C-alpha cells in the first residue's frame, strides 16, 4: 500500500484500544498496568497528532506564584531545600508528566510503515526525529495496529476509529 490515495485510510480520529509491550522471550506487559487512554489524529493535510496518557493522574497545582517559585528554585538556586508543599508539587508534576506522551508533525507512509516526523513533543529529545511504526489495518479500516521494535521490546498499539 503506497501513494496518496492510501493515506486517506489513515485520516480521522482514532482512540487507543490497547497498548502492550512484549519482550523477545514473549513476556508481555501493559504500560501503566493497562490504565491508559489516548487519541491519534491523522489530518488530510498529512499531519498527525498523538496523545497517550495514564488515566487518573494526580491533579496539579494551579497556584502560579507557588509554581513560579518552584521553577526558580529548580533552575536558579543551588540550595534546593523546598517546602513540603513544593515537594508535593514536584512529585505531582513528575507523575503527571511521566504518565503522558504527546507529539505532532507531518506523516508519510510506505508499503509497511508510517513515518511520524516530530515537530513538537512533550519529550524534547523526540523533536526533529522520525518515529517509524509498522502498520496494518483490519475490520474494514476500522482498526489500525501500529508496532515498533526498540531493543528487546516491541510496542504494539491498537487503535479503533472514532464513530
Describe these PLM feature segments.
Residues 1-163:
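Lipid interaction determinants
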Amino acid at each position: 500500500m503506497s501513494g496518496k490515495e492510501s493515506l486517506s485510510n489513515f485520516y480521522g480520529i482514532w482512540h487507543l484500544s490497547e497498548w502492550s509491550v512484549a519482550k523477545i522471550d514473549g513476556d508481555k506487559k501493559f504500560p501503566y498496568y493497562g490504565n491508559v487512554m489516548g487519541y491519534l489524529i491523522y489530518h488530510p493535510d498529512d499531519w498527525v497528532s498523538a496523545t497517550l496518557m495514564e488515566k487518573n493522574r494526580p491533579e496539579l497545582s494551579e497556584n502560579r506564584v507557588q509554581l513560579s517559585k518552584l521553577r526558580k528554585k529548580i533552575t536558579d538556586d543551588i540550595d534546593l531545600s523546598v517546602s513540603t508543599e513544593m515537594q508535593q508539587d514536584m512529585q505531582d508534576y513528575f507523575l503527571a508528566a511521566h504518565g503522558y506522551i504527546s507529539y505532532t508533525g507531518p506523516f508519510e507512509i510506505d508499503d509497511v510503515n508510517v513515518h511520524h516526523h516530530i515537530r513538537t513533543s512533550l519529550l524534547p529529545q523526540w523533536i526533529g526525529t522520525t518515529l517509524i511504526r509498522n502498520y496494518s489495518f483490519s475490520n474494514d479500516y476500522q482498526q489500525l495496529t501500529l508496532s515498533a521494535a526498540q531493543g528487546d521490546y516491541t510496542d504494539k498499539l491498537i487503535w479503533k476509529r472514532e464513530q
